[in-house]
Each structure stands twice: as structure tokens, then as C-alpha cells.
Amino acid sequence: PTSALLLLPVYRRVSRLFRLSDLMRCNGLVAVALTVALSGTVQAQSSGDDSSFPRKTNTSEAQQARQAQDAFEQTHRQGLRFYNGGADATCEEEIGRICYWNNNGDVPAPAERSDAKVERTQLISILERATKVSSDDDWIMGMLVRYDIEADRPDSALKVARACTGTAWWCSALQGLALHTLNDHAAATAAYQKMLNTMPANLRCSWTEIGLWLSSDSASQRAYRARPCEERMKSDMKLFRLAQPLWSLPSNDLYNELLARHTMSTVHGMGRIPYDIGWGNDLLESQVRYGWPVNWSVQNGGVGDPRPPSVIGHEPTPSYDFLASTTALANPFSATSADWPLNRKKARMRYAPRYASGYGIPPYQFARFRRGDSTVVAGAYRLIRELEMGRAPYNAALVLDALDGKDPIVVKRDNAPANAALLATIGATPFVASLEIVAPNGRRAARVREAVQPLPATRMVSDILLTTTGDPSARPSLETAASMAFGGADIDGGTTIGIYWENYLNVTPAAPGTTLIRATRVGASFLQRFTSALKLSKAVQPVSQRIQDPGRPDGGPGRSIALSWPQVPDGDYLLTLVVQNASGRDSTSTLIRVRDRK
């Protein structure tokens, strides 16, 4: 994503390296103390005395640090490189003075000039000297953590944050920011919880509210903010849980990201930034919704455009909208994978997790099997080329959450293959299932999430699980089928797949059963139905089999066959399986999508 400011002054590119000390002498800069009205920020009292936040010291080292920070950002802005992307970009969101557009997949931001990196290192050295005599200076500690993170030194940022002796809640916030940047999710959560427990109540309400993520309607925003803070924070936990990118992680990194955005925004509001405007609520909103910029550039409007270049702030890419739909929020136990559209247009928020350079939705299938009063859920996946997961190993997880405050059911498999199924047992209540695969080498993640209902005790047949081949043994089992799960419902015409199901009727040689298997095209035309009725085409019903079932010698329910799928037109086909004998009849179906190999 990229945000750009419009109608800004023309900036002169700087080609030579300025030493910060020289620039400060030449310009006669003095210490700058910006007082910014951050949304919800008040004169917060630090623990132990009456000093207000941000606490600032007046040592010579502190004054030099403030001068150096202001000088660095002036030079930084003047030397920004021109951006060659965004030719077709239009404002996706106009936020005050900011034009925001999503540039996932666009030209990357230009590399930062090398002298800017040197200048930042010089600034860090000045800030480090200041911390040795002013570790209780909230401004200095915040700036040093900020620039350590900008310089890709998160370990140094954490060391600085842990040495902070200023306002208690602010020191915890800086620790949370550094830990979040390091992907230490559990420790970041602990640090931010400590921050929330010690910061002023009205500031805590401001930092945790997510009205900007939910709706652009002002009435909805007012209604959201009108709710009592503690009530709102409690109900928001459901939204954060459903939006958490990976349930297999030890903590909710999206919640940490919200607090990290507020932390970094507070630091940005304390001093100069590359945008040549004062801090304001529009900048705060932009960063709370889409994150803070990690690269900067400038761009002309083109030939004949009289406007001066715009400063462009580039947030991390690719980024995604992890929020569940309003339908899923209202009724999560009826949700489908479509309720988590990662690439939603005109998203109210986006997030680029640092532990994964890309997210995708894999081909998948959930299938259910009875075990007494319980249900075994099979979550099958397949890693396809388009996911760009890279080489093995892969770590897979199936997480089922009843959203009742209890610990979720978690099944993990390290060194997982590219296609398989994980098995988990649930009771009589519905769950939301999250099937997750992470590729550590490729730094990619794939995830699918939808509701799973227990298989009713009255059902006489399980769901259908697609497998790569049939199991010819006399005792097919779910565990064997899971190991060769096809993963997904997209197949090529003219191929053979396996199917596994379980028959819960009392089938014996004395009371044999019959299994009917057929596939019917969804939305077939009149001509296709007519030619199929005359047996001239298999386009409407490519599969039709009747199997005699005398039961298994051991009485087990598992069944498996190989299913030949003829070459048929692309489209959706409903695969239906019917089991019956003298004691009863039942059926199950699953949707198959046939793709053209060409």
C-alpha cells in the first residue's frame, strides 16, 4: 500500500552526504518541541511523580538529540528518490490531506539512498549518547526505538526499550513495539497488556478502539464510540479473534499490530517526519488503518501537471484485509471461506505480517466422520504453484475454536507434505476451523477458515473425502485416507481420483447394502440435459456407479474406491453418494470443480 500527500512543495534532491553536525550549524537549528494533539492523548501522569507525558529532559545531550532528529528528517525529505510506479493509481481513500491507494503488486519503492542510511546511523549514535544521561526522557527513548527499527535493528530497539526508565506505560509500549517487530508475539502481548494496565483510562480506550476499521459511516462510528469502553473492548475481542491471521501462533499479532501502530504514531507525532506537514488526525487514521510507512519517495504528477511533487509513504507490502465479514461477525458458526476475503477492495484496514511475505488461500476440503458422540474433522489442503510457498518443509495446523473463551483444539504437523489432511475431534458444539500452512523457507503462509458443525448422530453416512487414489485394502481407514488426501475439490477432467467415506448403516452379508455414486453438472443447459438423456453425452452426469456392499469382515465403517472422471466441460459438478439397505437410507454430497487441462 502507498499513501501520498497532495500539493506539497517541490523538494530538491540531495546528492552529497550532509553530516548532521554541519547541517545543524549551517541552519542554526534549535531544539524543536512539537506539541501534537493525538486522538485520545491527554496529559498522562507517569507513575511516581506529576510530570506529564511525554517527559522530556533539558540536558545538553537531549537538546542535541532533538536538533539532530529535526535536521536528519529535513535532509531525508530533500533527498527522497522519485517513484516510478503508481501510474494508474487513483485515491482509494481520501483521509484529510492524504490520498491512499493500495499498490500490492505495483513497482517497489525505490531503494533508500546510501547517505541517508549513514545519516540515520549518525543520528542513532547521538540518541544513544543522550540515553546514557536521560533514560527517563520519553522523547529520546521513543525516537531511538523508532530509528533502530527503521535501520532494521530490532534487537537494539528492544535493548533500548528495556532500559527505559521514563513514563511506565510508555516504556512498556516501546517494549511491545520492539517485540512485535521481532515476531515475539507472546512477549509483545505481555508487554502491551502491562501498558494497558498502567496507562490512563481514556488513552487506553482510544488505543484499543477500532471504529476506523469497521465502517466509513459517521453514524456507525459515533454509535461504536458511544458504547462504554470496557464493554466495547470485551466485544472487540471476538472481532480480533476472527481476524487473527494465524490461530496456530501463541498470541494475536493483529491486536499487537494495532497497539504498535499507535505506539509508532505517538513517536511520529513528537517530531519531524518526511511528510512536510504537521502531525494530525489524518496521519494518525492512515497509520492506524494501514500501518506506518517503511519507505519514502516523491512523485511528479506528469507532463503538464502544475502541482509540485507529492511525498509518498510506502507501507509494507503485500498487505491484506484480515477482518471477517459482518455476516461472519454476526453468526460465525455459519461462516464460509468467502467471509475472509484477504484482498477485499476498498479495505478499511490492511496488515502485512512480518513473519510471512505473502498470504494465500489454498485448495482445501473439510470432511466429518462420526465417532460415537463425537465428530472427527478432517482438514485437507493442497499447496499449488500459485501460492508460491517455496521448498519444504511446511508446518501445518488445524485449529478449531468454539469462541467460548476456552482453549481451542490444536493439531499441528511439522514437516508436513504438500498435500494431506489433519484430523481433530470435536464434541457436540459447532466450531470455526482454521486450516493453516506456513513455509519457513519461503516465508509464506496459506490459510482457510470456515465454520464446522458436528455430524448429527442420526446421519448414516459421513462426508466424502477426496484422495489421490483409492484404497484397495479390505480395511480402509480414515487415517490412511488422510495421509493421501487430495486436498481441495478442483480436479482435472480425464483423471482418476479416490474417494473415502464411512457407512454407519448395519451392513452385513445377511443385510447387504447398496452404494450409489453419481456426479451431476450444476447449471447444465437444456441441450446438455437433452443429449445426456439420450445417452449421447456425459457432460451432465459424467459419473454414475452402483456398488454392492456386503459389509466389512471386521464391521468397520470405512469405504474407498478409485473414481474415473471422464473428460467433460469445465464447471461445477455435484458428487452425491447414497447408502442404503433394508434398515435405512442416507446420502451426502460435495461440490467438485472440473478444470480444463489446457
Q: Where do the language-model regions lie?
A:
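Bacterial N-terminal signal peptides
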Residues: 28-39
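Intrinsically disordered, low-complexity terminal regions enriched in Ser/Thr/Pro/Gly
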Residues: 53-96, 100-103, 329-598
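Alpha-helical repeat scaffolds
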Residues: 120-130, 154-164, 187-195
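TPR/TPR-like (Sel1-like) alpha-helical repeat modules
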Residues: 165-167, 180-203
